[in-house]
């Protein structure tokens, strides 16, 4: 007998300021917000494709990553996009740069990653690491 997984259902991450996180995930990244059950704590849910979600939870202890920059070896989740080029252009239009002095606006790009698919890494406002990847390099 095996676990027999269907898919990754959701990832939950701690956030310290829900309004700021909603602006980042909803307004900036353009993820559609989902209806969230009436829990006794604040949060927001976002769709990341069919039957997959990102759950933001306001958590007093925040994140373990305070003061850290973008590090692909740290805890992170990945969003697969259709076009690496389009994602890179979108992030640059939002102000992300590889040489940004502000960690929150710095992106780390790895178009020919050892993993076998192109990757971009950024931080959310609470310094949670987000990987954005594509099936292939389309630069």
Residue ranges, per PLM feature:
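Core segments of cupin and vicinal oxygen chelate
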Residues: 14-53
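N-terminal beta-strand motif that seeds the catalytic metal site of vicinal oxygen chelate
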Residues: 1-19, 74-79, 135-139
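Conserved catalytic-core motifs of GNAT/GCN5-like acyltransferases
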Residues: 32-38, 101-103, 109, 134
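Vicinal oxygen chelate
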Residues: 16-19, 77-126
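Helix-adjacent hinge/juxtasegments
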Residues: 56, 63-80
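Short beta->alpha transition motifs characteristic of CBS
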Residues: 113-116, 133-139
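Exposed loop/turn and edge beta-strand positions of beta-sandwich/beta-sheet ligand-binding modules
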Residues: 40, 73, 116
């Amino acid at each position: 007998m095996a676990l027999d997984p269907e898919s990754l259902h959701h990832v939950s991450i701690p956030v310290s300021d829900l309004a700021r996180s909603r602006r980042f995930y909803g307004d900036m990244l353009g993820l559609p917000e989902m209806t969230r059950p009436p829990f006794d704590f604040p949060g927001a849910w976002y769709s990341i494709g069919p039957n997959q979600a990102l759950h933001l939870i306001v958590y007093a202890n925040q994140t373990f990553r305070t003061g850290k920059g973008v590090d692909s070896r740290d805890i992170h989740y990945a969003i697969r996009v259709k076009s690496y080029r389009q994602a890179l252009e979108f992030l640059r239009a939002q102000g992300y740069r590889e040489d940004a002095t502000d960690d929150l606006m710095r992106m780390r790009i790895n178009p020919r990653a050892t993993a076998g698919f192109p990757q971009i890494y950024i931080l959310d406002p609470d310094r949670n690491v987000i990987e954005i990847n594509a099936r292939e390099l389309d630069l």
